[in-house]
Each structure stands twice: as C-alpha cells, then as structure tokens.
Design a protein with these regions (language model features):
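Short, electropositive alpha-helical surface patch
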Residues: 188-211, 230-235, 239
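Amphipathic alpha-helical oligomerization/assembly segments
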Residues: 34-51
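Core alpha/beta nucleotide-donor-binding catalytic domains of modification enzymes
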Residues: 54-175, 181-202
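Conserved S-adenosyl-L-methionine
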Residues: 213-224
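A short helix->loop->beta-strand "cap" motif at the edges of active sites that frequently abuts
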Residues: 171-174, 213, 232
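C-terminal recognition-helix end and immediately following basic linker
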Residues: 1-36
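Short, P/G- and charge-enriched loop/turn segments at secondary-structure junctions
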Residues: 129, 222-224, 347-350
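S-adenosyl-L-methionine-dependent DNA methyltransferase catalytic core
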Residues: 54-85, 207-210, 233-467
Length: 467
C-alpha cells in the first residue's frame, strides 16, 4: 500500500487526505533531524558556489608553423592538442595541400601583394599574433649557409633561419621548435665576411640567445617513434627566458605500442609503370620477403626512365673514366646490372626495398631520380617486376595517413612528401611540451648533440640528402 510522507517531520500516512489534514493544522510539525541536516548541507553548498571558481574550458596551446610545406608539423602538433592557427608557405602546391587539410589555419602573407615568400612578408603581418601564440615550429631550410666564404655570408636575408628568428622576436612565443637535417651539425658558416668560420649550430644558438631564447638540440631517428623510415633529423627546442630547456629526449620514444618498422602494409600489389626484372638479376634466388605478391599479369603505363636505365645496367661515365679515355662513350653498361636488394651497393645503384624493415630516407627528388623500388611477384606465371613507389605509399612511409589530401601533380606531391616533417615526430615533441616534461634549469642541457635514439636495424642509412 502506498504511503504519503510529510516533507518536514517525515511522518508517514496511509491516506493522502490524512497527510493534507496534517499539513493544514494550525500547530506545525517539527522538522526531523534528517531534514535539518539536509537543509544545512544545501546552504553550505550554496555558499561554496559563491566563493569557489569552478574550472572553465581549458584554452588550447596555439602555434604558428613556418616553412610549413604540406602540413606534416601541423598535423603532428594538432594531434598533440596544439592548435596551429596560422602558417607560412611559399610553394603553391604545398599551400593548397595545407589549406585543404587545415582550412581554418591562415597563410600569413604580405597584406597587399599577397606574396607568401617569408622574406617579403612584413613584420606587421606577424604582429597580430604577438603574445597570443605559445609556440612556433619551423622546418627551416638551411642550404644557403656559407661554406668557406663561397656565398655572400654578409647577406643575413640569404639565410632563412634569420626569418625564423625574426618572426620569433615579433611574436614572442614561449616555445620554439626547429627541424633540420642532421648534417647541419657538421656545417660551418659566418654572419659577415670578417668573422671566422664556426659551426652553424653555434650561430643559430647565438641568434636565438640574442633575442632572449635558450635552446637545446638533439638528433632523432624517426624510425624509433613510429615512422618506418631511417630518417635522422636535428631537432632544436627553445624556451623564452634565461633558463635552459632540458628535454627528456629518450622519452620521445616511449609508447604503449612498439613503433612501426615495416612498410609492407603500405605497398600495393599493382604493376602501374612497372618493369619486368631481367633474368640476369636471378630474382628467383632472392629471399621471398623482397616480393609483394600480385595477381596482375601485365604492366600498365611506362616505367620511369631511371628505373629503365638502372635495370638495363646503364650508367654515366665517371670523371676519372673520362680522363682515362676522352674518346669513350658517355655511358657504360654494367654487365651485372645496377639493381641490388636491401642495400645499395654504391652511388650508381638502385635498390629493391625490404618491406619488413624501415625504408631508406625519402627525399624530395625521388620523382626525378628514384633509386628505391618495390619488388612484385606473380607466383602463378612466375614473373618478377619492380616499380617506383607512388605518392600514396611514400606519404605513409613519411608518417602521413593514407587518406591525406595531397594536392598537385604526382611530382609535386612527392616533393611535398620528401620535404615534410614526419607528423609523428611533431606530435611526440608537442605532447612532451604540453605534458610539462621539459624542465627549465639555470645551466644548459649539454649541447653535444649525440643521437638520443638509434634507428631500427635491417636497412642501410644513407646520408641526409640522399635515399
């Protein structure tokens, strides 16, 4: 049987009419102890709400990307939780890709001419971001840095690193991240013709020091952080102020799952622009892991001219050979061919990649002179082919998703991929900074720049600027 309860004294009645009579009587009932306690608690909660500031939505860290390319650093930073509100990129195809994938990120250009060459973008275009952006990341080119005075080292605008410094000085972010080839550590330069040659990294350190930023740097092999490619890159991390950032470089490789070391899942079993491998290479004697199984039986399209040349064993004569025989032919035939497996035997050679280990470094000139090839085998008809990698495959080897919306021609896409910052690299660095794991100390971290992590084994690692 349902009961009816007085909200004051909590006395129960079998009939609703009895409760009504109880509530309407002249002598009101006394509140029960439980009601008194609940009333007191409600008052306390109300009072606390007046003095306690409840947390509001956290404003995400924001960033600007310079020399952005197709957006590898932007993708990585945004995956880490850092919003890239603006970027600067000069290349038209790369700009289209970045704008397509990140439509809310603004390309900072000259306000009147719309020139996106950072050298021509005035200070005023960056001033609106002053003290509003917490991070700048720049995969800055440094190919123009003088060596032995062969270039106009007195022209500071000749070095794009100066643009990185200029924008940093204007915007005043808390953090800066720079990315470059590891070979930068071995280069020397100078800021003016009278100055002695010294390591470029020291010049960069002093440039940032002069505007109030302290830096540390390290070489990272991206194969240790989820990118299936032996690609070693110099990473510079700086902080505004007088204290030095101490980065837990080894922890960049910390992950709940092991990094991807195989490229097999990225390689597609088609014969587009492929070339049948001649018998002289004895493909049937090569280990089976070099071959991607295919059911296709006929080549579609035209093989790249460099693939055709290498497969036929045709190479240019060296300078020494020309001196020895000035009347000889411009090109020579290597009777054993110029295709090797797993390891490039020399500068002339092309290589069939091992799909089960990290790939050699992908460079922006791959489409011009490819030397890394995919091997394919049809077991039914027992034929072997090799072909160049596609932009879709190369993009995934660089750490981009297969669905990334690359814009431009196939050549333009490959240039963008070769120049890109691998997204997982930018993501790991961004997460490390956001998590507060970069300590600030009075002394420098130690700028020996030995490699923080070593690459996975199995494939040769060529120079930064080559496959």
């Amino acid at each position: 049987m349902p009961t009816h309860t007085c909200p004051t004294c909590l006395k129960e009645f079998a009939q609703k009419g009895h409760l009504t009579a109880h509530l309407n009587r002249k002598k009101k009932c006394e509140p029960s102890a439980l009601v008194i306690r609940l009333t007191s608690l409600e008052a306390e909660v109300k009072e606390l709400r007046n003095v306690v500031v409840l947390p509001t939505e956290v404003t995400p860290m924001t960033a600007i990307s310079l020399f952005s390319g197709a957006g590898g650093d932007t993708l990585g930073l945004e995956r880490a939780g850092i919003k890239v509100v603006a970027f600067n990129e000069f290349n038209e195809a790369a700009t289209k890709t970045h704008t397509t994938v990140f439509p809310s990120s603004v390309n900072i250009v000259h306000p009147e001419t719309k020139d996106s060459n950072i050298r021509n973008v005035p200070d005023s275009a960056f001033e609106s971001y002053k003290n509003k952006v917490q991070l700048i990341m720049a995969g800055f080119p440094c190919q123009g840095m003088s060596h032995a005075g062969k270039k106009r080292v007195d022209d500071k605008r000749n070095e794009l690193v100066h643009e990185f410094v200029r924008v940093t000085k204007i915007v005043q972010p808390e953090w800066i991240i720079g990315e470059n080839v590891k070979g930068l550590l071995s280069r020397k330069g100078r800021l003016n013709p009278e100055a002695p040659l010294r390591p470029v990294i020291e010049i960069i350190r002093d440039l940032f020091d002069s505007i109030g930023y302290r830096i540390t740097y390290q070489v990272i092999d991206v194969s240790t952080i989820g990118v299936p490619q032996n690609r070693k890159r110099l990473i510079i991390i700086g902080h505004r102020g007088t204290t030095y950032p101490h980065v837990p470089w080894n922890s960049l490789t910390d992950a709940s799952t092991p990094p991807t070391t195989s490229i097999r899942s990225f390689l597609e079993p088609h014969l587009d622009d492929a070339m049948e491998l001649p018998a002289l290479y004895k493909p049937q004697d090569q280990p089976s892991h070099y071959w991607i199984p295919t059911t296709e039986t006929a080549v579609k399209g035209t093989p790249h001219k460099n693939l055709d040349r290498l497969t036929r064993g045709l190479r240019n004569r060296s300078s020494a050979e020309k001196v020895a025989d000035p009347t000889g032919p411009d090109q020579l035939i290597e009777p054993e061919g110029l295709i090797s497996f797993g390891v490039r035997k020399g500068g002339y050679y092309g290589m069939v990649v091992n799909p089960d280990v990290p790939c050699n470094t992908i460079i922006s000139t791959y489409n011009l002179c490819p030397r890394l090839f995919v091997g394919l085998y049809n077991p039914t008809i027992r034929k072997y082919w090799i072909r160049c990698m596609t932009s879709k495959e190369l993009g995934q080897i660089q750490g981009f998703p297969a669905t990334y919306q690359w814009q431009g021609t196939e050549k333009e896409k490959i240039i963008q991929i070769g120049n890109a910052v691998p997204p997982p690299l930018a993501e790991r660095i961004g997460r490390t900074i956001l998590a507060g794991r970069v300590e600030l100390k009075e002394e420098a971290q130690g700028l020996e720049a030995t490699e923080a992590v070593t690459g996975a084994t199995g494939a040769t690692v060529d120079d930064d600027d080559d496959e």
